[in-house]
Amino acid sequence: MWRRTYLLLLLIRAYFALSPSYIHPDEHFQGLEVFAGRILSYPSRLPWEFTSERPIRSVFPLYPIYGVPISLLKWFYTETGTESPPAELVYYVVRGVMFLLSFVLEDWAVHDLVPLPRHRRVALVLVASSYVTWTHQTHTFSNSLETLLVAWGLVLINRIIDNKRRSSLFSCAILSFICVAGIFNRITFPAFLVLSLGLVVYNFPRRPLSFFSLVGFGLVFFCIAVFADTTFYKPSASFADVLRSPVITPLNNLLYNTDNSNLALHGLHPHYNHFLVNLPQLLGPALVAMVLQAYNRGFIASWFKNLRAASALSATAMLSIFPHQEPRFLIPCVPLLLSCLQVRKSRIFLGAWVIFNATLGFLMGVYHQGGVVSTQLAVPSVISTTTSLWHESLKGTQSLFATVVWWKTYSPPLWLLGDNSTLNLNIDTRDLMGKPGSEMVKELERLVPTCGSKQKSTELTSSLEQPDAVFVVAPKSVTFLDQFLAPQSPDSSLELLELWSYKKHISLDDLDFGSDGVLPTMKRVIGRRGLGVWLAQRPGCRAIDS
């Protein structure tokens, strides 16, 4: 029975892995935006983590996950003599890679970490039925990679400790790679393994070869990581330059995150936020069950002896010291804690667990900013189709310049625009984020050509400040746009003509319970869900009639 349940949950995980939801900008801008721009020459806008004088993000642990699949796709398309791979294919291939890593490495690690077969089956089903596994773990987060590295770090530590007759040289060498990759991936990684590594160090006097294997290979992998980062950020650097001025991203990251003034830019939280807000958000009814079981003294004693529980709770406590706390920072705790839960046959728990994960699974895995990826993938074809008549009137091979204004959404990943050289398009993306509606209108007033400059459509300029066409992408739940929807009277200053929409999109940032009330807000955000693309034009001189 449990095998059929597990296979069903595996299909659910695959469904969410291939659903284009958008949980957080970091899943694109701290990985795919970088490698798609560098390898495929797609449009890209690197975040400050990669462009500052002291970059804080390492490419060493990311290249095998993102760079290798993208490079293989590029090689295949080059060998077949075709153009660059479409951005949509790259997106789903990398998502498929994340699904396989989650299925193979995460589940395998849970299988190895839980010793008793009866408890192992329950642990596998609990982890496989968590919405965090369906969504966060199949997205391109550094936290998702951290989860795998933490889990396998614990697996190897268990093997080293249990194997008392041999030195476990190979396990120590692999553990050293995991530690280096984990630290270069996220500086929070040591918090999850510090207690477990203490047990390994305790055994070193009896097995000195294990010590030399761990430290020796660790130094080798550290040097490789520093060399990879230095040559990435300084492509023209020689070997001597790498030795003189290496780029050590974990050190830069640590210096940045230990400065509270820097953390304040990202949002400060109370120190109890991880325990009282983030863990309940990730675990739901499972956390309630753990708290209820904590009243059993024997259960508490067993948890302190449990390496998985001790690692998760100690890491949560250490990460709570820092005032910037997001739920995804605790993603590695989810499989560790769920694998410790002793679930009895309870219909109440089962019902609550199913409802909790189904609700958050569809919210975070399908609807949360779900239209951003699909819309960005569709933008080139929408612009090309809309402006086809203008394009036919152009002379020569001049490109058509289009400005796309994104409003009240997460930042659109530019790499999803792909290679548009064959469409003869030059797309300028303006991200207005959550600016007030009045500022958005001012931006459109500045960009949209007036009726007196209508000839611009056939007399192109090379300036992106004066586009040939202006498009607006915004949630359909934003009622502010209703006053501009076509048709408008000729006396109006702006008119928005809807061209395209994606229904599975909900913007939680658009919730305004204080001004509108709870029920009206939920009715608006859910009832008018979707992301739309509009053509902005002057009603007195429409390029396209509604």
UniProtKB/Swiss-Prot annotation:
Subcellular location: Endoplasmic reticulum membrane
Enzyme class: transferase
Glycosylation sites recorded in the entry for this protein: N420
Residues passing through the membrane, by range: 5-25, 58-78, 96-116, 141-161, 174-194, 208-228, 348-368
Signal peptide: none
One Gene Ontology cellular component: endoplasmic reticulum membrane
Keywords for this protein: Endoplasmic reticulum, Glycoprotein, Glycosyltransferase, GPI-anchor biosynthesis, Membrane, Transferase, Transmembrane, Transmembrane helix
One of the protein's GO biological processes: GPI anchor biosynthetic process
EC annotation from Swiss-Prot or TrEMBL: 2.4.1.-
Domain of life: Eukaryota
Functional pathway: Glycolipid biosynthesis; glycosylphosphatidylinositol-anchor biosynthesis
Membrane topology field: Multi-pass membrane protein
A matching Pfam family: Glyco_transf_22
Family assignment from sequence similarity: Belongs to the glycosyltransferase 22 family. PIGZ subfamily.
PANTHER family with a match to the protein in the record: GLYCOSYLTRANSFERASE (PTHR22760), GPI MANNOSYLTRANSFERASE 4 (PTHR22760:SF3)
UniProt name for this protein: GPI mannosyltransferase 4
The organism's taxonomic lineage, starting at the top: Eukaryota, Fungi, Dikarya, Ascomycota, Pezizomycotina
Recorded name of the encoding gene: smp3
